[in-house]
């Protein structure tokens, strides 16, 4: 009898306003949705909290998108550099997965829910999908070298937005940016010209030089 009374007491406790969510932060179209707890939590409050939530949520989405695209390329890359790219992309996938988990947990630590739903990725990521089917190794290299830069630039905005009000979040985002910049270099180095080798990528691209990477438009 005491057991059921205790369970009832706990149920009543969690039904009180103290355990309710204090609100959501979401865009006009409902994505992403980050519920904010009314319970005491770590991290910043007010505007600083909202800035950190936005920075962490966008970083989470881009890392999840990169998880999907690194696997797509890992499976389907074809050409001379199949094996080294196959292995490298697995390493990159594992790295972005690790940081995605840390970013999501930081959202929870500062009192917000993490939105990692498929629809949220589709609607809010600024990184496009890889093409379907088999993918040429030169295409994989330029795709990742370009889009890692897109993600790094976005993370950089989050670092600046959170550095004054939430240095812990800013420091975490700096770690993530460091990893993404390393991955970008590892791709770019495969077609990086040097004083002794123009390294046009033609040997990977049926004798045709790989078009130079263009810097993506700034993140919105």
Pin down the residues of each PLM region:
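Conserved ASCE/P-loop NTPase catalytic core
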Residues: 9
């Amino acid at each position: 009898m005491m057991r059921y009374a205790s369970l009832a007491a706990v149920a009543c406790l969690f039904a009180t306003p103290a355990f309710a969510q204090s609100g959501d932060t979401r865009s006009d179209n409902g994505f992403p949705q980050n519920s904010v707890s009314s319970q005491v939590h770590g991290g910043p409050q007010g505007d600083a909290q909202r800035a950190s939530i936005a920075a962490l949520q966008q970083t989470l989405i881009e890392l999840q998108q990169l998880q999907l695209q690194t696997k797509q390329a890992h499976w389907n890359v074809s050409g001379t550099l199949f094996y080294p790219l196959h292995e490298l992309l697995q390493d990159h996938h594992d790295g972005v997965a690790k940081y995605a988990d840390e970013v999501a947990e930081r959202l929870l630590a500062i009192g917000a829910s993490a939105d990692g739903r498929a629809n949220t990725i589709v609607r809010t990521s600024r990184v496009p999908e890889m093409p379907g089917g088999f993918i040429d190794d030169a295409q994989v290299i330029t795709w990742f070298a370009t889009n890692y830069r897109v993600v790094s630039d976005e993370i950089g905005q989050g670092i600046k937005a959170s550095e004054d009000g939430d240095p812990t979040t800013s420091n975490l985002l700096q770690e993530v940016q460091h990893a993404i910049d390393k991955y970008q270099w590892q791709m770019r180095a495969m077609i990086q010209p040097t004083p002794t080798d123009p390294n046009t990528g033609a040997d990977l691209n049926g004798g045709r030089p790989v078009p130079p990477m263009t810097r993506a438009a700034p993140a919105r």
